[in-house]
Amino acid sequence: MNFLAHLHLAHLADSSLSGNLLADFVRGNPATHYPPDVVEGIYMHRRIDVMTDNLPEVREAREWFRHETRRVAPITLDVMWDHFLSRHWTQISPDFPLQAFVAYAHAQVATILPDSPPRFVNLNDYLWSEKWLERYRDMDFIQNVLNGMANRRPRLDALRDSWYDLDAHYDALEERFWHFYPRMMAQAARKAL
C-alpha cells in the first residue's frame, strides 16, 4: 500500500492518519519521539505492509514482473494499488468524496509536521500542493511517480521499467485489487489490522 491506501485504511480503523503516513520515515521504536496515537498509527502501517506483502493476490502479482524488475515489484505494486483506489474512489467511498478526504487527511497530518523528520516535511510540501493522491488515478502520473523514485534512488532504477509490467498486466492487477482491498477495508473497520 502507498500513501492513499494507508490513509484510507487508517481512517476506517479510526487510527492516526498522521502516524500511518509518517511510518516510512521512522526507524525503530517510535514511542520515545511521538504521542501514543501516532505511535499506534506507525505500528498499524507496519502491520499493513507485512500483511499486504503476504497476500496471495500480491504474491501472485509479483510473479508477473519480468526478471529485471521483479526486485522492485513490491514498491511498484504499492503505487499501483493507490492508482486503483483513487480511480475507483467513488465506488469504494461514496459518502466521502476523494477531494474532501484529501483535505481531511491533510489537516490531520499537518498537526505533526513541526515535530517531523525533514524528509517527511519535504514529502508533505509536494504531496498536498501537487495533489498526488487525486492524480494517482492517472497512469501517466503513476509512471512519473516511478521515474521520480528511480531518480532519487539510483539503486531502484528498475522502477522505470516496471511501468511496462503494470501496463502489460493492468486488467489482472485491477482484478486482484478488487479481491483483496475490500477485505482489508472490512478488517480496518473491525480494527483488525
Swiss-Prot record:
<comment type="function">
    <text>Converts holo-ACP to apo-ACP by hydrolytic cleavage of the phosphopantetheine prosthetic group from ACP.</text>
</comment>
<keyword id="KW-0443">Lipid metabolism</keyword>
<protein>
    <recommendedName>
        <fullName>Acyl carrier protein phosphodiesterase</fullName>
        <ecNumber>3.1.4.14</ecNumber>
    </recommendedName>
</protein>
<keyword id="KW-0378">Hydrolase</keyword>
<keyword id="KW-0276">Fatty acid metabolism</keyword>
<keyword id="KW-0444">Lipid biosynthesis</keyword>
<keyword id="KW-0275">Fatty acid biosynthesis</keyword>
<comment type="similarity">
    <text>Belongs to the AcpH family.</text>
</comment>
<dbReference type="Pfam" id="PF04336">
    <property type="entry name" value="ACP_PD"/>
</dbReference>
<dbReference type="GO" id="GO:0008770">
    <property type="term" value="F:[acyl-carrier-protein] phosphodiesterase activity"/>
</dbReference>
<dbReference type="GO" id="GO:0006633">
    <property type="term" value="P:fatty acid biosynthetic process"/>
</dbReference>
<dbReference type="InterPro" id="IPR007431">
    <property type="entry name" value="ACP_PD"/>
</dbReference>
<dbReference type="InterPro" id="IPR023491">
    <property type="entry name" value="ACP_phosphodiesterase_gpbac"/>
</dbReference>
